[in-house]
Amino acid sequence: MIYHNPVLKGFYPDPSVCSYNGKYYMVCSSFQYFPGVPLFESSDLVNWKQIGYVLTRPIQVMLDKINSSGGVFAPTIRCNNGRFYMVTTNDTTHQNFYVYTDDIYGEWSEPIYVDQGGIDPSLFFEDGRTYFMSNGADDNGVGGVVQCEIDIATGKKLSPSRCIWQGSGGRYLESPHLYKINGVYYLMAAEGGTEYGHMITCARADSVWGKFEGNPKNPVLTNRNKAPFIIQGIGHGDLVQDEYGDWHVLSLGFRQQHIWRPYHHLGREVFLTPVKFGEDGWFTCGNDGTTDESYEIKGDFTQNEQRVFTFANTSWDKEWCFMRRPVMENYELSDDKAVLHGSDITLDDVDSPTFIAMRQRDFNMEMTSTVKLTGSAGAVGGLTVLITENEHYDILLEKSESGCKAVLMLNIGGIKHRQNELPIGGDSAKFTIKADNYGYSFFCGEVQLGYGSTKYLSSEVAEGFTGVMTGLYAARGTAEFTGFECRYN
């Protein structure tokens, strides 16, 4: 069967995967969005269905007033003796922690913290022992992939933290994962930074503590020299073996807006690449160490992709998410409408505005909804495409003493520009946002209010590690949204 990359589109970076009872489970980073750490299930590694989130209670994760790209990132999921563990970093508090569950479809535990610094933590289980690793500095100040043994029940360290590998020489060593395959310990990591120089490297040893020998052909996977090619930034991966005994790596990567336009705004997505072990015991990935647009995988199934999203066919506790620590009393959500009671907090604030959103999953998109606004002068409500509090485009109804206007606001680098406005004879309007690789066109009814370039919502310009979110928003009044549809062409 031929599948096409990415296997999960939109801002779902830092994938980690494990298998249990014939199913595969994957988690991704969520940063400042809540609930945290989206959780997916698959039976074939290609079709992924979101089954919930790992961090669903504010007590599990503190996200109050954190900047964009802060919060929770680089999770790892593992299963040991039927219990699932998710370990991650909360950059807000500079702490590594894990949670667990015995029911993958249920709630997860309160966080258990580990007294080892660094970021991108991972777990490895063997013979009743648990090893915790991250990239940082060990107890002697030596930097690299750092490992200690822990008590999995309490998180307490049972050994000193020791640097076990310093990488192959690339900058920003991160994303360590340890595997035991055919009696050999393989340590996989990412280097080069999560941009165009991103890569996956590996080392191996005869002991869990090393000494680890780097693969002489490192990196084992990178698209840094694959040009002109739309898929770039491949790195931060996790190995998984399928039911046929074949190995694969799930990694992040991104799609440029065009092969000659080095900007990406959809965020880092999930790519699946085959892995082969050679007679020398080293593994290679993809096409001579690169990730391509399509591959063949064993299995009798069809690659499916949801192309239309409505209130009725999405779940408020799955596809949708909020910003930081939402005030849930401000939301009334049902199968046919959403009512948002706006506060004084706006999208420009490093706070929790009344805002609910989904990831933008592809370049060609059309999002539409009828918006009805109630409130006094200064109330606003409408649709937005947002990557940070400083970079977002908003088509809004705005209340004034003289009535309602439809306004188009472009926010670029913290500079606010009112591109256009249109008086409305009432308190409701139908808004549409049409997107392609290069820009967003904004409509009130049949009238185009303006246009915003995708370039300014890209990671290269806006900076950070997230991707564009398509959302509903209200401030200083109440906005009712009906007839919502987000369609990918």
Predicted regions and their residues:
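Carbohydrate-active catalytic/glycan-binding domains of CAZyme proteins
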Residues: 1-489
